[in-house]
């Protein structure tokens, strides 16, 4: 039987040794959406982040679990948040009703979640932030394994 990656409890990074940087949760962030495994972008002030929206360009990274917290604990506005910026395999949140297959390119969706990149004009769907490591097709938000490696340039799906 083949070996595979296991989704660990209370951590987001599954494999790899990525760069992790602390940023402040910005004033424009929605605290309830600032959960580990959600994608973030820069907020209005230096060194601050907020949840990414759909089709975002300029992704900073995704939120990691604070050492003294649990995976279900959201960061509050003003908290110092751990943001993973480097390449790794991570357990991230796929938007409900997205049908992805291993290897599909992923882009940001609302509230810092991920969605499958659809066929479209180059750059019209935001940055490709990674690729699905497993398939998913459920009607609720789902944790999936993602090869996190944000692209430097937008690319169209084919």
Q: Where do the language-model regions lie?
A:
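Surface-exposed, low-hydrophobicity beta-strand/loop segments enriched in small/polar/acidic residues
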Residues: 1-158
């Amino acid at each position: 039987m083949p070996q595979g990656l296991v989704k660990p409890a209370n951590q987001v990074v599954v494999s790899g040794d990525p760069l992790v940087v602390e940023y402040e949760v910005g004033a424009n962030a929605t605290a309830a959406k600032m959960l580990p495994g959600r994608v973030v972008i820069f907020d209005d002030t230096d060194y601050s982040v907020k949840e990414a929206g759909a089709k975002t360009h300029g992704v900073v990274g995704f939120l990691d679990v604070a050492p003294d917290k649990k995976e279900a604990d959201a960061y509050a506005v003003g908290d110092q948040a751990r943001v993973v910026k480097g390449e790794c395999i991570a357990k991230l949140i796929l938007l409900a009703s997205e049908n992805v297959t291993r290897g599909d390119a992923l882009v940001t969706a609302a509230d810092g979640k991920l969605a499958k990149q659809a066929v479209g004009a180059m750059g019209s769907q935001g940055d490709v932030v990674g690729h699905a490591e497993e398939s998913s097709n459920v009607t609720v938000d789902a944790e999936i394994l993602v090869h996190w490696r944000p692209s430097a340039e937008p690319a169209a799906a084919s």
